[in-house]
C-alpha cells in the first residue's frame, strides 16, 4: 500500500474524528500528526511487543515520602465536608494532591468517594478517563460518580446508578497538566507519553495507599475508557512487575470501555461501522476505493475532496453517540422546580460538559475540593497534552499487554463497547480482539439488565470477557447508566452477566 493512499485514509479519518474534539478537545493538527505517523509505518504492520517490553523494564523512582508530610494528617485535610450545592449523602469523599516527584514539584489531583455501604470490605477501583489529557472528573460528574450537575452549573443531584454503590471509587487526573494536576517544572509538559504516565500513576497509587492504609491489601481494580485503553493495561502491568517489592498491590482485574487498543485496525473498523450504519454511503466508499485504495491512486486532490465530502455528510451529528442530539445552547439556566423534575440521570443532557466546566471553575467548589490555586481555568481536556503526546505511544498496540495479563489466574480482563459510538466503534474493538486469537468458551449471547437486553457478550479462555451495551455511546455510563452499573457489578463480583431477564 503506497504512502499516498495511506495519507488519504488518514486525511479522511482526521476529518471524521475532528468532530469528536467537542469532548476530547484534540486539535485538528494533533490528530493529523498522529494519523500521518501511523501512515508512515504502514497499516499492515504486525502487532509488536515493544510496549510490553518497555513496561517490563519501566524504571520507577522510589515513591518514599521525603517531605516529612504526615499522611494521616494530610488525609484528614483532604476530607471534603460538602461540595457546594450537593444533596446529603451517607458516604465520605476526599480530594487533594499526591506529589509524584518532589524535586520537580509534580503533583496529581484525585477525587475519592467511599462506597455507600459496607465500605470496609468492598474493593477499591481506580477510574481513568482518556484523551490523552482528559480529566477523570468528567467520569466523576458526568458518568459513574455519585453526583450530576444541573443546568445552572452550581447545583448537584444524585446519580442512583453511581458505581460507588458497589465499590470505593478513586478518580485520578493524569497525566500531569490534566485538570487540576500540575507541575512546577515546565519540561514535564514538553514530551508526555505512555511510559511517563504509567510511572507517575504507579507512584501516585503507592503514595495514596500510604495516606489511606485501610485499602492496602484490599481487592484493587483499574477501569477506564477511550485512551485509557493504554493507561489501564500499562498500569496493571507496571503493578505486577513491581509487586515483588514491599509495595504489594492486590490487583484483581481491569475493565476498559470503548478502548484504544490497536492502531492498525482503527481505519478498517471505522469504515466498516460508518457504512453498516448508513453514515457513509456505499457510493462514497466505492468512490474511495476507486480513487484512493489502489496500487496507483489518482491525484491526491481526489482523495482529499472525497474526505471532505464524507466529513460534510456526518459532521452535524454527535459522533460519540449517533442516537443523541448535540449541544445547541450551552447557556446556564436558573434552577426551577420544573427543571428539577425534568432532570434525571436517565435523560441524556447534551450540554452536560459545559455544566461541569462551570461548576469546577467556581471558587467555592475548588476551595471545598482542596484545589491549589492554578493560573488557568479547569478544562475538560488539555489540548497541548494530546498534541505533544509521543507519537510512537499513540500507535502502540496494547494487545500483547492484554495477553500477558491473561496469564495471571487471579486477574480478569473485561472489555466493553457502547454500540452507537463512531469514535472507537465496536467494529474496531472486534477487529482488535480477533487479532488476539482468543478461544471462546461461550456463545455470543444477549445479556440482560433490569429485564431488558443490555447488550451482547462472549467469554474467552484466560478470564477475558467482551460485552457490548445497546444504545450506549463512547462513554457508556453516561448514556446507559443502568446497564453500565449492571456490567460493573458483575465484573466486581466475578460473575457472568445475566443471560435471562
Curated annotation (Swiss-Prot):
Glycosylation site positions: 65, 101, 329, 337, 390, 437
SUPFAM superfamilies referenced in this protein's UniProt entry, alphabetically: alpha/beta-Hydrolases (SSF53474)
Name recorded for this polypeptide: Serine carboxypeptidase-like 39
Disulfide bonds: 134-381, 292-303, 327-351
Active site residues according to the UniProt entry: 226, 421, 474
Signal peptide (UniProt feature, chain positions): 1-25
Keywords, in A-Z order: Carboxypeptidase, Disulfide bond, Glycoprotein, Hydrolase, Protease, Secreted, Signal
Species assigned in the record: Arabidopsis thaliana (Mouse-ear cress)
Amino acid at each position: 500500500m503506497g504512502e499516498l493512499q495511506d495519507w488519504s485514509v488518514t486525511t479522511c479519518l482526521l476529518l471524521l474524528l475532528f468532530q469528536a474534539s467537542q469532548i476530547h478537545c484534540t486539535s485538528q493538527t494533533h490528530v493529523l500528526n498522529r494519523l500521518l505517523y501511523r501512515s508512515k509505518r504502514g497499516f499492515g504492520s504486525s502487532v509488536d511487543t515493544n510496549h510490553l517490553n518497555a513496561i517490563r523494564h519501566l524504571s520507577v523512582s522510589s515513591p518514599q515520602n521525603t517531605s516529612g508530610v504526615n499522611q494521616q494528617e494530610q488525609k484528614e485535610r483532604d476530607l471534603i465536608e460538602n461540595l457546594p450545592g450537593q444533596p446529603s449523602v451517607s458516604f465520605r469523599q476526599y480530594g487533594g494532591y499526591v506529589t509524584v516527584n518532589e524535586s520537580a514539584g509534580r503533583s496529581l489531583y484525585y477525587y475519592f468517594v467511599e462506597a455507600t455501604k459496607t465500605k470496609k470490605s468492598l474493593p477499591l477501583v481506580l477510574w481513568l478517563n482518556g484523551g490523552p489529557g482528559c480529566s477523570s472528573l468528567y467520569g466523576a460528574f458526568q458518568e459513574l460518580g455519585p453526583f450530576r450537575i444541573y443546568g445552572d452549573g452550581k447545583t448537584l443531584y444524585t446519580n442512583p446508578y453511581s458505581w460507588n454503590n458497589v465499590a470505593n471509587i478513586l478518580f485520578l487526573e493524569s497525566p500531569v497538566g490534566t485538570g487540576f494536576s500540575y507541575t512546577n517544572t515546565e519540561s514535564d509538559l514538553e514530551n508526555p507519553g505512555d511510559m511517563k504516565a504509567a510511572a507517575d500513576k504507579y507512584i501516585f497509587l503507592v503514595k495514596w495507599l500510604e495516606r489511606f492504609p485501610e485499602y492496602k491489601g484490599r481487592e484493587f481494580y483499574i477501569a477506564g475508557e477511550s485512551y485509557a485503553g493504554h493507561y489501564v493495561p500499562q498500569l496493571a502491568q507496571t503493578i505486577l512487575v513491581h509487586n515483588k517489592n514491599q509495595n504489594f498491590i492486590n490487583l484483581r482485574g481491569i475493565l476498559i470501555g470503548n478502548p484504544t487498543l490497536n492502531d492498525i485496525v482503527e481505519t478498517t473498523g471505522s469504515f466498516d461501522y460508518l457504512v453498516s450504519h448508513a453514515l457513509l454511503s456505499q457510493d462514497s466508499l466505492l468512490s474511495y476505493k476507486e480513487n484512493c485504495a489502489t496500487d496507483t491512486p489518482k491525484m491526491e486532490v481526489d482523495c482529499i475532496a472525497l474526505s471532505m465530502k464524507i466529513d460534510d455528510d456526518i459532521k452535524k451529528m454527535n459522533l460519540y453517540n449517533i442516537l443523541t442530539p448535540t449541544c445547541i445552547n450551552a447557556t446556564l439556566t436558573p434552577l426551577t422546580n420544573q427543571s428539577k423534575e425534568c432532570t434525571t440521570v436517565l435523560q441524556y443532557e447534551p450540554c452536560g460538559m459545559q455544566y461541569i466546566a462551570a461548576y469546577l471553575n467556581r471558587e467555592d467548589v475548588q476551595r471545598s475540593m482542596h484545589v491549589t490555586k492554578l493560573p488557568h481555568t479547569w478544562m475538560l481536556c488539555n489540548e497541548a497534552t494530546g498534541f505533544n503526546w509521543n507519537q510512537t505511544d499513540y500507535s502502540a498496540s496494547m494487545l500483547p499487554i492484554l495477553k500477558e495479563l491473561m496469564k495471571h489466574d487471579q486477574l480478569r480482563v473485561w472489555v466493553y463497547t457502547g454500540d452507537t459510538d463512531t469514535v472507537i466503534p465496536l467494529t474496531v474493538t472486534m477487529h482488535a480482539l480477533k487479532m488476539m486469537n482468543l478461544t471462546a468458551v461461550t456463545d455470543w449471547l444477549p445479556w440482560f439488565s433490569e429485564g431488558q437486553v443490555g447488550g451482547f457478550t462472549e467469554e474467552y479462555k484466560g478470564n477475558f470477557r467482551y460485552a457490548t451495551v445497546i444504545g450506549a455511546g463512547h462513554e457508556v455510563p453516561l448514556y446507559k447508566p443502568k446497564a453500565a452499573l449492571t456490567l460493573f457489578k458483575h465484573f466486581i463480583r466475578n460473575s457472568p452477566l445475566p443471560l435471562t431477564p
